[in-house]
Amino acid sequence: MPPKGNKHPIAQRQSQQKLQKQWDEEETWDDSQAEEVSDEEAEEQMESWDSLDEEDLEDVEEETIASDKAPSFKKPVRSQPPKTIPPLPPQPCSLKASRRWDTVSIAGSPTAPAAPTKRLEKTPRVRKTSSAIATRQDSPATQELRKRIFPTLYAIFQQSRGQQLELKVKNRSLRSLTRSCLYHRSEDQLQRTLEDAEALFNKYCSVSLKD
C-alpha cells in the first residue's frame, strides 16, 4: 500500500486537472460564442452594406431621372439677317385702275376676288322711224306733199346762208319745218307744213330772188 502522505498530492493533481478541463471547456464555449457573435455581426454588417448599396443605387437612379427631366437650356440662336427678296418684274396693268371695293386690297390682306356682277339687260329703245321708212309707209298723197315741201325748204336754206337772223314764220323755224317734213305722216300735218314753208319762203326769199 502506498503511503498516506502521497494521497494529498494526487488529489490535488486530480482537482487541478478537473479545474483545467472546466477552464478549457469554458474557453472553448466562450470561443464558440465569440465566433457565433462575430459571425452574426459579420452577417449584419453585410446586410447593412447590401442595404446601403441598394439605397445608393436608388439615389443614383433618382438623380439620373431628375437630371433627364430637368429642362435643357439651349444656346441662343443668332438672328440671321433678313434675306432680300428680288423685285418682281412689272406686270402689264389695265389702263384704268379699278376702284371697286371688292377688288381694292386692304393693307396686309390679299386682294379679294371681284364679285360676279350681273349685267343689266338694257331695254330696247324705241327707235324713231327714219324718213326713208316713213316714205315707204306713206300714201301717194303724203308722198306728193313731201316732194313739194322739201324743195321749198332747200331753197330757203340756200338763201338764208350767211344770215345771222333766225328765219321764223308763225313761231316755226326752218328747222322745225324740216323735221315735220321728214317725220310727219298725216296729210293734214304735211299740208300745214307746206303752207308754212311757202309763207317763210315768201317772207324772206322772194325779195332776194326778185333782186
From Swiss-Prot:
Localization of this protein: Host nucleus
What are the boundaries of the region Necessary for nuclear subcellular location? 154-181
Pfam families attached to this UniProt entry: Adeno_L433K_22K
Which chain regions cross the lipid bilayer? none
Bias (Pro residues) ranges: 83-92
Keywords attached to this entry: Host nucleus, Host-virus interaction, Late protein, mRNA processing, Phosphoprotein, Viral capsid assembly, Viral genome packaging, Viral release from host cell
Q: What does this protein do?
A: Promotes alternative splicing of late transcripts by promoting splicing at weak 3' splice sites. Required for the temporal activation of major late pre-mRNA splicing at late times of infection. Induces the splicing and expression of the late capsid vertex protein. Probably functions as the small terminase that is part of the molecular motor that translocates genomic DNA in empty capsid during DNA packaging. This motor is located at a unique vertex and comprises at least the IVa2 ATPase, the small terminase 33K and probably a portal. Forms a ring-like structure of about 17 nm in which genomic DNA is translocated into the capsid. Stimulates IVa2 ATPase activity in the presence of the viral genome. Once the DNA is packaged, the terminase detaches: the 33K protein is present in the empty particles, but not in the mature virions.
UniProt remark on domains: The tiny Arg-Ser repeat region (RS repeat) is necessary for the splicing enhancer function.
* Subunit-structure text: Homooligomer. Interacts with DBP; this interaction occurs at a unique vertex during genome packaging. Interacts with IVa2; this interaction occurs at a unique vertex during genome packaging and seems to potentiate IVa2 and 33K oligomerization.
Q: What name appears for this protein in its UniProt entry?
A: Protein 33K
